[in-house]
């Protein structure tokens, strides 16, 4: 590059003509960490860990496919003339909301087949989902995508960011806002909050709904800073969906508390309180 700033190599491993990109490595790492955390949460909740493994065997590939389909739908003007690019997810282009939709639908169907509580499953995996999203954003970082508007190097330095982040935000002759980082840090904070509130007297399902509210709230504002938002006419799709999910989640919490009296989070499926560890 003209000013000597070099981006990080997006390729993690090169074996002959076969290359493994950091994007894929980071996404795979996020999945593994999410699985291990979900198994740990299941153990605390006295839930059979095989249920979590069986769920994720289905949910992971379906979520990846739905995330890609979601992205392709809203970028169809490009993909209709580049059909071969649709399967090349290592080039980037998977939407978190698409993945969430796929995961929720899978969990609903799975819970009905297994005759277990969807809300109990959702609560167990909620911390895993948000930390996986925090990690996954670094895949966007390696691909130099999901960034914000143009800015200056001095502004990035004022944030006390390490040089490797600042340099990676230098794209095509300009520096950009590291919105990937803002969202990653927001998700890490959300992860910590979920771990704290799961020990309080919340009702079953509210940990997952709290995750949806927290993530959607942050995503709404961060999305407004991005330059690569998926659009539907004049609307940013993720902002519209964020508002919808916030309202829907709050409405579900209120309705369930008023009409359904759901059990507390720390009660297992037999109604017994699980001892806190």
From Swiss-Prot:
Gene Ontology cellular component terms for the protein in this record: plasma membrane
A GO molecular function annotation here is:
phosphatidylglycerol-prolipoprotein diacylglyceryl transferase activity
The protein's enzyme class: transferase
- What is this protein called in UniProt? Phosphatidylglycerol--prolipoprotein diacylglyceryl transferase
> Gene name on record?
lgt
Keyword set for this entry? Cell membrane, Membrane, Transferase, Transmembrane, Transmembrane helix
Q: Supply the source organism for this entry.
A: Listeria monocytogenes serovar 1/2a (strain ATCC BAA-679 / EGD-e)
According to its UniProt record, the EC number is: 2.5.1.145
Q: What does this protein do?
A: Catalyzes the transfer of the diacylglyceryl group from phosphatidylglycerol to the sulfhydryl group of the N-terminal cysteine of a prolipoprotein, the first step in the formation of mature lipoproteins.
């Amino acid at each position: 590059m003209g000013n000597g700033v070099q981006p990080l190599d997006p390729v993690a491993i090169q074996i002959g003509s076969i290359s493994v990109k950091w994007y894929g490595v980071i996404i795979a790492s996020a999945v593994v960490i999410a699985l291990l955390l979900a198994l740990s949460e299941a153990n605390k909740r006295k839930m059979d860990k095989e249920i979590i493994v069986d769920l994720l065997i289905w949910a992971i590939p379906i979520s990846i496919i739905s995330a890609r389909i979601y992205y392709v739908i809203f970028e169809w003007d490009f993909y209709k003339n580049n059909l071969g690019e649709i399967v090349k997810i290592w080039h980037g282009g998977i939407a978190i909301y698409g993945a969430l939709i796929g995961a929720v639908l899978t969990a609903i169907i799975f819970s009905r087949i297994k005759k277990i509580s969807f809300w109990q499953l959702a609560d167990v995996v909620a911390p895993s989902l948000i930390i996986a999203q925090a990690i996954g954003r670094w895949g966007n970082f390696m691909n130099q995508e999901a960034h914000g508007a143009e800015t200056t190097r001095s502004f990035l330095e004022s944030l006390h960011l390490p040089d490797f982040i600042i340099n990676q935000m230098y794209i095509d002759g300009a520096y950009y806002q590291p919105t990937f980082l803002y969202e990653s840090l927001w998700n890490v904070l959300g992860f910590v909050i979920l771990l704290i509130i799961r020990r309080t007297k919340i009702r079953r399902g509210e940990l997952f709904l709290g995750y949806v509210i927290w993530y959607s709230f942050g995503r709404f504002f961060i999305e407004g800073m991005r330059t690569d938002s998926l659009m539907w006419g004049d609307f940013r799709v993720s902002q519209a969906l964020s508002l919808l999910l916030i309202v829907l989640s709050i409405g579900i919490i209120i309705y369930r508390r008023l009409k359904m009296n759901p059990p507390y989070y720390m009660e297992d499926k037999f109604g017994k309180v699980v001892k806190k560890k």
